[in-house]
Amino acid sequence: MFDQAILNNVLGKGFDFMGIADSPKNGQDKRYNKIKSFLLKSNFSGFTKDDLFIMQFIKKGWGHDIAALSNMAEAFMNFSHSNPAKIPEYQQLLSEVVFRALHPKVNPYKKDIKNVKYLGKYGYYLEHLNIILGCYQKICGNEYIELNEKICKHLIANSFQYENFHADLLPHVKMKWSADQAAILYSIWLYDENNGTFLGKNLTQKWLHWMKTYGTH
């Protein structure tokens, strides 16, 4: 068991990529440069304890690797709107995010996901990958649109298997979290927003109705 102080520190800093702390503006610049350096580093073979704070204590990192990459992708997408002059740089960095998200050291299938016929009960990984692919399409192009659509349809079908409209997050784990389902729905909305489709409309309506009726107190 962890010492409680250590555990609290892990939970408080788990997503703190490379553990950077400083004044807001200075800290943001340092964080961006650290992340940029990480993404442009060659020979990626998975995250290390020097990349993710939580891995100093938990070897596999509780899935913080794909979540950290998802956060990076959203940041680059947002930066492309606020600072369009640097879009080429953000496109390059987002391409590196996708490469790492699909890497066998990050994806739970341990092989090229394009060769995986059934995506299974890996909703946690897929929700973040789907967000990454949506961000990529938004500012880079359609290279991964087929995979993006495949994941959307898989998550929708899996969600509809349950009366509470919550997709599976991990194999052999029955627990579901509404925050993750909201992220799943957001990832599908991002695909719809990019492509003028309505794949997630029905599921979103049913999930919101279920949450309003049974999921709040």
Predicted features along the sequence, with ranges:
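Beta-strand-rich domains and repeat architectures in extracellular enzymes and scaffolds
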Residues: 54-75
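Extended ligand-binding clefts on enzyme/binding-domain cores
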Residues: 146, 174-183, 187-217
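Long, well-ordered core segments of solenoidal/helical folds
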Residues: 5, 9-10, 14-15, 19-58, ...
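Acidic, serine/threonine-rich, charge-biased low-complexity segments
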Residues: 1-2
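Extended ligand-binding groove/face enriched in aromatic
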Residues: 68, 76-182
